């Protein structure tokens, strides 16, 4: 039953085989349903819900009064099926104690009224999701919705049968044995062909009944996503529907039934349920849901018979599918797709058999969070573990090979390309789900989660690229995700997310002080249905990559009537557009930074692109920049923390290996102090950066402005000093190609200029601090 779904798409005209005497119904309700006849002039309208046809369900409206009617289906029925009197009884009991169900109003056993028994309940308005992926909501909301479902199930299973006055609602102990027996008989009565897997599964279930087959709880029997109505705006369950299969039995049967989608065979469509994939961000793992359920019920999360309940659930689903097809053959099933059920009985039974042979650990792995001020999400913890393992097993061992490729191709046409090992590593990372981790809407990770991952990837110069988390692509993908049109996303964001192309960002200019972004002179002028771009850019990172296909350009769409912060816009410029001229690569302390596609000077000479390439709108450039730079600065700073950890490791290794003046280097007090100061500095900037990430998670970019500015100053300064000490400890080797320290120093020193020089951030911090102090002073006065 699906009452309460918003919109008219869930309703249709009453099917011919389900039509009944509406006048007879109206006369009965006028007599027996209080308030129904209050609006005498109003006409009774009846529509049928497209879903919920096992027991046909109808939407009734008379004036301002709305109700839901549920009845038995017509025709020959399987024994003990479609007992709507039980539905009414259990809903009445649950409603009386405040459990979320539609209010049951009236039950009619007189079959002369509309041809079968029926009952009336209230119409509940809310959200019903039929797709397991719950599209259209954020990963955080999707996760919260799933948690709410499991908490509601735990609440149901915690109810006392006696207090509900439902003694006798079920037979008692031995539920699992009865289920195997009942569904075996139901299947055999409806079978249209011999399916050995059903017989084998039935026999296995009967031989492997759980020892505790004496639990007696109220269970739903068909607990799934589309039997839930959520609050229109909140992640809260306001009604559980379809109590046709409810009884007294073992609670784990409900939990297993809800968990079916984790193992659903790929060859079988989940009719009206969408499709589940481990990549569906925000959907908790099965172990997480079990942990929540068990915690709510106060029971141990180790479930020794979990494979039995999963196998039983698939056995029941196969039996139900066979019953649906049987009714189709008899002409009693109104569902348009009921004929499809003939082909899914066997794969469901085979899946049940496979699960019967598996052993499950339903307990979540314990991850030590002691001492963490900024706690990760469970998914963040799991991904971080996988990233650390991937770094250790695959990325760091490839560092020498990647470095040698660029040394050998320094003067070659291939110097802007990537060694083959990078493509192999990318394929491996994508296969393990370690892809696009920086984008919360795609990865389902928080800023704190990704900050700690960024620290790990900062330990190797090419690691971010392996996970498709390399600047400037990350910032450009964030721009397109947050501000791009659907057309822009399809054309550019999707291939960027797949890693098929790369991009560059063109903001800084050689002829103006770009630390004041309002100085930007590159012009973007509207001409009919196009924009024409003219200007010079430099430090356009990534432009030398052969896969770089698109640039995001910041320029002036001047309107003197607007403030100076609303005179700039961002526009998409394909790199092969006539007039785009790549002038030269710029070196950084002598490095051309080949791996990252270099840093280029680019000229735009009468470059014409469609007006649809403008992002968000004219004058929105700085607004977009702030959205782009906030997360990017956190990523940069946490990568420098990882870089600092690597530099400190090198420093300590060298200090323990080398002897000078008859003692190890670490025994010299100055070196020991460098080591100590390095550890102190790393811990300080890590905490400050994690605080900024936490502020972004909780307050957004605007609320984290001060913290982001502080880390942008503190992290590069501190890490530059740490790398400098490491170089000093390593001596001449520290500035050679035998160590990554010289490159590390170049990277960290540049960060004191990139994304705004220290002095600009310091001025901003001072302004914000003075404003905050003034507010406190005013409050005291």
Swiss-Prot record:
Modified residues (N6-succinyllysine): 392
Phosphotyrosine PTM sites in chain numbering: 325
Source lineage: Eukaryota, Metazoa, Chordata, Craniata, Vertebrata
Enzyme superclass (EC): oxidoreductase
Known cofactor(s): FAD
UniProt KW keywords: Acetylation, FAD, Fatty acid metabolism, Flavoprotein, Lipid metabolism, Membrane, Mitochondrion, Oxidoreductase, Peroxisome, Phosphoprotein
Subcellular compartments: Peroxisome; Mitochondrion membrane
Keyword Cell wall biogenesis/degradation recorded: no
Principal location class: other
Similarity-based family: Belongs to the acyl-CoA dehydrogenase family.
Catalysed reaction, written as an equation: a 2,3-saturated acyl-CoA + oxidized [electron-transfer flavoprotein] + H(+) = a (2E)-enoyl-CoA + reduced [electron-transfer flavoprotein]; docosanoyl-CoA + oxidized [electron-transfer flavoprotein] + H(+) = (2E)-docosenoyl-CoA + reduced [electron-transfer flavoprotein]; tetracosanoyl-CoA + oxidized [electron-transfer flavoprotein] + H(+) = (2E)-tetracosenoyl-CoA + reduced [electron-transfer flavoprotein]; eicosanoyl-CoA + oxidized [electron-transfer flavoprotein] + H(+) = (2E)-eicosenoyl-CoA + reduced [electron-transfer flavoprotein]
Molecular function via GO: flavin adenine dinucleotide binding; long-chain fatty acyl-CoA dehydrogenase activity; medium-chain fatty acyl-CoA dehydrogenase activity; very-long-chain fatty acyl-CoA dehydrogenase activity
Pathway the protein acts in: Lipid metabolism; fatty acid beta-oxidation
Binding site for substrate: 515, 630-633, 756
E.C. no: 1.3.8.-
Full protein name: Acyl-CoA dehydrogenase family member 11
Function noted in UniProt: Acyl-CoA dehydrogenase, that exhibits maximal activity towards saturated C22-CoA. Probably participates in beta-oxydation and energy production but could also play a role in the metabolism of specific fatty acids to control fatty acids composition of cellular lipids in brain.
Pfam families: Acyl-CoA_dh_1 (PF00441), Acyl-CoA_dh_M (PF02770), Acyl-CoA_dh_N (PF02771), APH (PF01636)
GO BP: any one term: fatty acid beta-oxidation using acyl-CoA dehydrogenase
Gene Ontology, cellular component aspect: mitochondrial membrane; nucleus; peroxisome
Assembly and binders: Homodimer.
Ranges in a coiled coil: none
Cited InterPro entries: ACAD10_11_N, Acyl-CoA_dehydrogenase, Acyl-CoA_Oxase/DH_mid-dom, Acyl-CoA_Oxase/DH_mid-dom_sf, AcylCo_DH-like_C, AcylCo_DH/oxidase_C, AcylCoA_DH/ox_N, AcylCoA_DH/ox_N_sf
